[in-house]
Amino acid sequence: MSIIVNLDVVMAKRKISAGELAEKVGITPANLSILKNNKAKAVRFSTLEEICQVLECQPGDILQYIPDK
């Protein structure tokens, strides 16, 4: 099973840079990069909530579940 983070897609639609998003969410650009590049092992609900507020989206717009074949 894989969880894919489609943050780049939503960021592009909202025309927001990684630096701007990190600042508004209150996380470091390095941590945002880890999340964007699907390297994160976990994400706090509070961080996900902030990202959704800033990007005006739902968690399902950012996260995608890919089942194992």
Where are these regions (language model features)?
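Short C-terminal boundary/hinge segments that cap the last helix of small helical domains
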Residues: 56-69
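A short, Lys/Arg-rich alpha-helix, primarily the initiator
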Residues: 1-16
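Residue-level detection of the helix-turn-helix DNA-binding "recognition helix"
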Residues: 12, 26, 37, 67
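Short alpha-helical DNA-recognition segment
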Residues: 16-34
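The alpha-helix within a helix-turn-helix
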Residues: 11, 22, 52
